[in-house]
Amino acid sequence: MAMHAKATPPQIPDTRRELSELVKRKQELAETLVNLERQIYAFEGSYLEDTQMYGNIIRGWDRYLTNQKNSNSKTDRRNRKFKEAERLFSKSSVTSVAAVCALGGIPDHMNEKREPGSGTESDTSPDLQNQENEPSQEDTEEADGALQDLKPQKAASTSSGSHHSSHKKRKNKNRHRFDMKMNKKPRADYSA
């Protein structure tokens, strides 16, 4: 009694069909993500414009009680302007920049600071960590005139150094700029 049982070969999945379905699904999800990022960008912009005069979650609510509504619509429009740096929610997403750039929402100068292929600026960049330690634009403009004589020397001294700079060096640099503004000459203990 020989039983011949037909051995059925195991089902081989159609990997090409499965791959094409996954690629389509990925494209659909990418489109959905782009639309969500655009909506967040638009809602955030309208929120920042509407709440600029009185306060918002980004700048705080200090002006809510002190600011009274002006009847002058021209002043109202001028006060509704806000900085791109205040777009906290849009900038918190890695994919937001690509989605909003497709709309033309973020100016080109905002994209220049980004590393190619990264999508966002690194959270560990010195610019983000020491933003409060950096002098304001007015301070640097005033100090630039006094520092023009020192710039060639500074460039020569730092050109042989490594590309990595420490927090302490930046702190001393800011102190040096402040001394230049106040005293118009650097203190001996800060120059290196």
UniProtKB/Swiss-Prot annotation:
Q: Which UniProt keywords apply?
A: Activator, Centromere, Chromatin regulator, Chromosome, Coiled coil, Kinetochore, Nucleus, Transcription, Transcription regulation
GO CC terms in record: kinetochore; MOZ/MORF histone acetyltransferase complex; NuA4 histone acetyltransferase complex; nucleolus
Query: Which parts of the chain span the membrane according to its record?
Result: none
Q: Where is the composition biased (Basic and acidic residues)?
A: 177-192
Family to which the UniProt record says this protein belongs: Belongs to the EAF6 family.
How this chain assembles, per its entry, is: Component of the NuA4 histone acetyltransferase complex. Component of the hbo1 complex. Component of the moz/morf complex.
What InterPro entries has UniProt attached to this entry? Eaf6 (IPR015418)
Q: Fetch the Pfam families from UniProt.
A: NuA4
Main location, first listed in the record: nucleus
What residue spans carry the Acidic residues bias annotation?
A: 135-144
Regions of biased composition (Basic residues) lie at 164-176
Main role?
Component of the NuA4 histone acetyltransferase complex which is involved in transcriptional activation of select genes principally by acetylation of nucleosomal histone H4 and H2A. This modification may both alter nucleosome - DNA interactions and promote interaction of the modified histones with other proteins which positively regulate transcription. Component of HBO1 complexes, which specifically mediate acetylation of histone H3 at 'Lys-14' (H3K14ac), and have reduced activity toward histone H4. Component of the MOZ/MORF complex which has a histone H3 acetyltransferase activity.
Q: What is this protein called?
A: Chromatin modification-related protein MEAF6
Instruction: Write out the annotated subcellular location.
Output: Nucleus, Nucleolus; Chromosome, Centromere, Kinetochore
Which regions form coiled coils?
A: 11-45
* GO biological process terms on file: chromatin remodeling
Report the source organism: Danio rerio
The organism's taxonomic lineage, starting at the top:
Eukaryota, Metazoa, Chordata, Craniata, Vertebrata
Composition bias (Polar residues) maps to 119-134
Task: State the residue spans of region: Disordered.
Answer: 106-192
Tree of life domain: Eukaryota
